[in-house]
Amino acid sequence: MAPPRKLHIKSYGCQMNVYDAQRMVDVLAPEGFVETATVDDADLVILNTCHIREKASEKVYSELGRLRLARDEAASSGRRMQIAVAGCVAQAEGEEIVRRAPVVDVVVGPQSYHHLPQLLARADQAGRALETEFPVEDKFGFLPQPRPETIRARGISAFVTVQEGCDKFCTFCVVPYTRGAEVSRPVSAIIDDVKRLADNGVREITLIGQNVNAYHGEGPDSRAWTLGRLLRRLAAVPGIVRLRYSTSHPNDVDDELIEAHRDLDALMPFVHLPVQSGSDPILAAMNRKHTAADYRRVIDRFRAVRPQIAFSSDFIVGFPGETEADFAATLALVTQIGYAGAYSFKYSPRPGTPAADMQEMVPAAVMDERLERLQQLIDSQQSAFNKAAIGQTVDVLFERAGRKPGQIVGRTAYLQPAHVFPGPMFLGPGMAPDSLVGQILPVRVDSLERYSLLGELAAKPPQHARPLAATGA
């Protein structure tokens, strides 16, 4: 039997890329590849790229320069290293990648990575292989299922892609061009995926998509299902105790999604709902198709049915034409909503998008100053949200052993990391702290450490608790 080949994947960007990287591992496992944590001993290196932020492609070319040196070093010891560029930069740049970086063997877009084995074989024969067209077939129908031991090794939380692409065409965004039009997976395929994950120890599922609440997959009744209806079905899967979804668009929040948050205990009271700006003129220039008031009404609808719900968001400062009054409207919106956290970025033009051709660019110094002011406000809100947990008892889903001996780490319903030292009084004879992995237990929060909650167990775990790896659950 041939020895296994080593695979190293460096993934950039969004949750979708994390999921895609895992599926690339699944695609290549039948070809004899196993993951390695470093480039040094890799036979194949894949850069799974993101094209959302400024200079994304230049970062890839810089990394390829470093990989050229690693490849030369491997060759000097008689070992061949193949290099592939996948993801959205691959989709956007295509042949330009191999022109600028001849070290690359394979270029593959995000809708075609199920063809990686064939592309690697083609590169062996022809020197390189490119595939950046949107394929006719649905890649999900060709992706192999991960092995049970692989699922267990990935932990108790898992991403499941339910939708890809976007039809919104925000003027700053490349996603419609790199990921294509909105496509939703069938309900039956998603249910099968979630059941398989639950059978192998997964307790928390995050449904992901570029515009996840635009989900409209075909259900077993041959009708299109909404995300809310899908969540209701998945909440009934045995073993799944927490459900999340990301990323959402305000315009696609419908009654069924609101009602799902009202009715489903498993659906976490934490929603990432990007707004980008609080200024109506800027929202119009971004082609967001909603106003700041529309966004506030959506927030109010969630809070009306689930008062404890919290939100995070995305913001862009310095969009072309943004005035101080526009920026003040963003600060006002953030103040009014009150976020548990948010991501803020300076505008950067993405080639091929309408905003890249807009005039009235905001000076870099002004963008820097606005970003700092916005981030200070967001940080203060996040700090206040976390401090409010001190003295409270919160439910924590434990995920893994901590870095410190005797420590266990999990997350709250709001994705706050929680660090606990259970101690012998909370553990049975012979039980290690990681025997709590996969359980939801009450934690009394005593203090904070940066963004993490520190506390103690407020109740003893069940006597039958055992590590998931031991049960094979």
From Swiss-Prot:
GO molecular function, one term: 4 iron, 4 sulfur cluster binding
Domain Radical SAM core: 152-384
Binding-site list for [4Fe-4S] cluster 1: 14, 50, 88
CDD domains, alphabetized: Radical_SAM
Keyword hit for Transport: no
Cofactor: [4Fe-4S] cluster
Binding-site positions, [4Fe-4S] cluster 2: 166, 170, 173
Domain TRAM: 387-459
EC number assigned by the record: 2.8.4.3
InterPro entries: Elp3/MiaA/NifB-like_rSAM, Methylthiotransferase, Methylthiotransferase_CS, Methylthiotransferase_N, Methylthiotransferase_N_sf, MiaB_methiolase, rSAM, rSAM_horseshoe
Keyword Glycoprotein annotated: no
Entry keywords, A to Z: 4Fe-4S, Cytoplasm, Iron, Iron-sulfur, Metal-binding, S-adenosyl-L-methionine, Transferase, tRNA processing
Matching PANTHER family: CDK5 REGULATORY SUBUNIT-ASSOCIATED PROTEIN 1, MITOCHONDRIAL TRNA METHYLTHIOTRANSFERASE CDK5RAP1
Oligomeric and partner information: Monomer.
The protein, known as: tRNA-2-methylthio-N(6)-dimethylallyladenosine synthase
